[in-house]
Amino acid sequence: MLNSPDLILSTSLIPESDFAFSDAERQALRVLAEQAAELAARPIEIEKRALWTRHNALKPTRPVIFCDPENSWNEIIPPEALACQNPIARAWEFHLRKQVFWGAEMGDDYSVLPYFPVE
């Protein structure tokens, strides 16, 4: 029952889309991806990834700080701030905007990753 394809498809977080992104959507995603990549390449982000690796391996580290706005992301990045209209482009834009905000504003030990997870 729990592995029923109908259940899996009906509860999927992946929005339906034809992947027909407009030129403006592609450009908006490219700009955000470039910003996220620049943040991820900073030496501090590399240090944070090493810190988390040591911490998760149960090696002595300083306490790590992780600030996740969780349900407040829609206040930090309101829907009207998103440029993309295509559902998948919009989800990717939201993800990238979160990464840029986290890397530029948050000041915690979360590390902006140098890759884009497509799930």
Regions found by a protein language model. Give the residues of each.
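N-terminal basic, low-complexity leaders that serve as flexible interaction/assembly modules and, when applicable
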Residues: 1-119
